[in-house]
C-alpha cells in the first residue's frame, strides 16, 4: 500500500492540494472507508516525522446538547425575552424532536466542538492539506475536483450512494445544445403528425395539415394572380409582338411561384413547432432562458471568407496568366531579334561559322558584333544583362539577371588623329588672305604721301 503514500505526498506536500477521502477513493479505486484510513495513517506518520506538516479536517455527526441548540437570546436569566406585546402561549402539541447535526471541524478546534455534542455517532478524517483550514472555499474546490474526476467502471464498488433514477447530463457547447433541441422538436413533430390517418385520435392533427395546405394553395393563387394582373396592365402592343415572349414570361412566373411555396411550407412547421410546449429541464426551469446560438452570423462570416478566398484565387490565377503571357512575348521577341540578326549577317560569314568541324578551344564571345557600316553609321548587336522574373519550383517569383543580345544603330566615333589635321588646315588658310590684304590696301599716311 505504498502507492497511496506516494500519491498523497505528491498532491499534498509537493503541489499543496487539499485531498478528500472521496477524491482519494476515486483516484486509487478503493473503498471510501479504506480511503479514510489512508488519510488518517498518512496524517499520523507525517506529523510523527515532522510536526505540523499536514493538517486534517474532521467530519463529526451526532446530536448536540439542548443548551447549545438554543439561540443566544434565550440564554438570559430565566429565558424570557422582553417584548412590547407578547402573544398568548401556545400549548405544546407534540414532543420535542431530536436534531442531528453534521459539521466539518478543523483539527485545532476539534476538542471544543466535541464538547458541544451530547452524543457522537461517527467521526472520521474528511480531508488533509498542507496548511490549517481557515477557508471553506478550499473544501468546495476539492469537492468540485471530485465531481470532475471521471469514475471509470462501476461506482458502486466504491460504495458511492447513487440514485438509480438520476440522469447525468454532460455540459456541452451551445451548438450541440441547439442540435439536440432541434432533434427533440423534430421527434415531437413526427409524433404529432403520424403517417396512418385512420386513427381516431388524429382528428385534431388532420386539421393542422389541412390548414397548412389551404395556406399553401392561397399563396400559390396569389403568386399566380399577381403576374397575371401585371400582364393585363401591360400595353397591347407588347402582347402583339409575339407569343414567344409570353411563353417565357409565363415560365418565369411559374418558377417564382414554385420558389415561394417551399418558403411557406418551411414557415408553417416553424409556427407549429412554436406552439408545441417544450419540455422543462430537471431543475424545473424553462430552457428558453438559455442563450441560443446564432448560426446566421457564423454562416455569413463563412460565406464572406469563402468569397474572399475565391477572389484571391482568381486574382492569383489572372496574375500568373499575365506573367506567362509576358514571358512568352519576351521569348518570341528575342527569337525574332536573333533571326533578324542572323539574316543581316553577310553570306560569307555564315558558312565560316558552320565550316569548323574540328573541336577548337572555347573563345570568349565579343561584347559587340558590328554587322554593317553605312554613311558613318554602324549597326550590330551587343551583350546586355537583363533582369527576368522566373517562377521557381516552390511557386515563388525570382528575379534573375541573364546575358542577352541587343541590336543597336549609332554613329561611328571619329578617329582621334584626323581632327588635329583638320584643325591645322583652316588655320593656314586663314593666315594667307591676311597677308594679301596688307599688301593691297596700305595705310592712310601712304595715300597722303603719294599726293
UniProtKB/Swiss-Prot annotation:
Residues 376-386 have a biased composition (Basic residues). The lineage of its organism: Eukaryota, Fungi, Dikarya, Ascomycota, Pezizomycotina. The keyword DNA damage applies. The keyword DNA damage applies. Gene3D superfamilies: DNA polymerase delta, p66 (Cdc27) subunit, wHTH domain. It is found in: Nucleus. One of its GO terms (cellular component) is delta DNA polymerase complex. Residues 329-353 have a biased composition (Acidic residues). This is DNA polymerase delta subunit 3. Residues 306-316, 354-366 have a biased composition (Basic and acidic residues). Residues 200-216 have a biased composition (Polar residues). Component of the DNA polymerase delta complex which consists of PolD1, PolD2, PolD3 and PolD4, with PolD1 bearing DNA polymerase and 3' to 5' proofreading exonuclease activities. Directly interacts with PCNA. The PIP-box mediates the interaction with PCNA. Keywords: DNA damage, DNA repair, DNA replication, Nucleus. It comes from the Eukaryota.
